[in-house]
């Protein structure tokens, strides 16, 4: 994947980065797919998008504390979401920091700092991830220390917030874990959820004072999906999904 890079000298950078190993970074890249196709190239609009951010003058240059603070304020305004809870400790003065901005179709996917060959993810934009996954998956922040709600073992439904969480909780509560258990591919999962949000049988609809909320049911092979979605402009955002497996009752071990 092509990258645009900014070299930063400040040790304070480490306070903003979340630690991932190179193998985890490879896994992160592997998961960003559109119907199974790996995102490999930067679109022609990427350079213009970078120019529009005002960060183009920092590409492949070292910057001081002032520029670093300005840079961080700019990316903070894009609503960056941490990808992991652990924070890498400070390193020595001689280390160089390279922060790379990834683009796809003119959108910033992620920023990471490369310290000694180890990738340290800072965050990703929810808009970018939602676009990559078909603009129907709502991305929610993962707040460190937030307790997981207890699961109701008596229910045959598994309530799964459709937040694409590229962190530890992605494995624990993500929809993909459920589909893996049921032997459905990631691309099929994405296309199924997209169809469920648009083609399902309407059960109920209402307005919450801001947007229209739809509740639909959709059958896919042995699965029944009850999908709650929100209409925002011309975009359908999936907020919640209850999944029933016709072959068995879902257990706590499913996700």
Swiss-Prot record:
Residues excised as propeptide: 1-101, 145-255
Entry GO CC: extracellular region
GO BP term, example: defense response to Gram-positive bacterium
UniProt key word Amino-acid biosynthesis: no
Keywords annotated in UniProt: Antibiotic, Antimicrobial, Bacteriocin, Secreted
Chief location category: secreted
Top-level division of the source organism's lineage: Bacteria
Localization: Secreted
General function of this protein: Bacteriocin with specific antibacterial activity against strains of P.freudenreichii. No antibacterial activity was detected against P.acidipropionici, P.jensenii and P.thoenii.
Protein name per Swiss-Prot or TrEMBL: Propionicin-F
Lineage, broadest ranks: Bacteria, Bacillati, Actinomycetota, Actinomycetes, Propionibacteriales
Recorded name of the encoding gene: pcfA
